[in-house]
């Protein structure tokens, strides 16, 4: 699963809209949609915000692990 698919799945699991997350990241809804479609790379600082919001690790978002916890391996 790509990071774009992962951030979409996480958003949907939390019953949030693209507009909700776009406001949090201070970007337009279209920009956030492009992140989820993989058309635009999401900035690292935005990934950090999402990892904190969803209480998951950056490794999970980037599909380096399937463990949802904040600190896999601990």
Predicted regions and their residues:
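Conserved hydrophobic/aromatic packing and binding residues within compact polymer-binding modules
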Residues: 7, 21-22, 32-35, 61
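Conserved amphipathic alpha-helical interaction elements at protein-protein interfaces in regulatory
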Residues: 9, 13, 53-56, 67
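Recognition helix of helix-turn-helix/homeodomain-like DNA-binding domains
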Residues: 26-41
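Short basic helix-loop element that most often maps to the first helix and adjoining turn
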Residues: 5-24, 49
């Amino acid at each position: 699963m790509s990071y774009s698919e992962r951030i979409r799945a996480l958003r949907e699991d939390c019953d949030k809209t693209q507009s909700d997350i776009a406001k949090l990241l201070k970007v337009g809804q279209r920009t956030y949609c492009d992140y989820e479609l993989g058309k635009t790379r999401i900035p690292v600082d935005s990934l950090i915000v999402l990892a904190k919001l969803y209480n998951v690790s950056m490794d999970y978002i980037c599909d380096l692990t399937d463990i949802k916890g904040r600190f896999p391996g601990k």
